[in-house]
Amino acid sequence: MTKLDTLIQELCPDGVIYKPILDVADVLYGYPCQAKLFNSEANGMPLARIRDVLAGTTTTYTTENVPAMYNLQYGDLLVGMDGNFHVGNWKMNTGVLCQRVCKFCSKDEEYVILNSYLSHLLPPVMKRVEESKQSGTVKHLLAKDISTIKVPVPPIGVQREIVRILDNFTELTAELTAELTARKKQYEFYRNELLSFTMKSEW
């Protein structure tokens, strides 16, 4: 029996409770920023738009005086609201939440739900919401869609163990990806060298 199995058996023997996501997390919808104030010269505040959600970084800035409530900090959990409902963590030290991107934040991280648990939980949840939308048009995530979402909320101890397991897996995956990328470059180098030698020998 794994540590997770033991925790589940001890802390939630009757199963995990599902709660409306708005009962455990606050959602902030992005500010309608003015495009005419955007720039790529790092002038002003970094701007988190839909295209930036997965990467968690941006090259677009705004000089607009956006209310402070829309300011972002490192690690904030973002969801894109058009097209693909991507989920990602903001990786810059500051930023501004732009319209059609929303931010999720635990109402009570100490006793109810961890932000790190939400980070792992939301991608499959949003994928299901996205797939439930009619195809053939650009899909839009609406506030009413979010209000219908229910999520499993195990005890904090169980959440911490789930996060630990998934974080370790993510780290291993990143290491394997880096290794595969390096091997691919190595293969391409030797392939090009060998093909170059073959071509020379034919002359």
PLM feature spans:
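Basic, amphipathic alpha-helical recognition segments used for DNA target recognition
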Residues: 20-28, 94, 102-152
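Non-catalytic DNA-recognition/assembly elements of restriction-modification systems
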Residues: 8-31
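DNA target-recognition patches
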Residues: 22-25, 34-63
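Short, solvent-exposed loop/turn positions at domain surfaces
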Residues: 10, 65-66, 90, 135
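A short beta-sheet element
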Residues: 49, 68-123
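Amphipathic alpha-helical segments
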Residues: 1-2, 13-17, 114, 147-184, ...
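Accessory (non-catalytic) regions of SAM-dependent nucleic-acid methyltransferases
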Residues: 1-11, 202
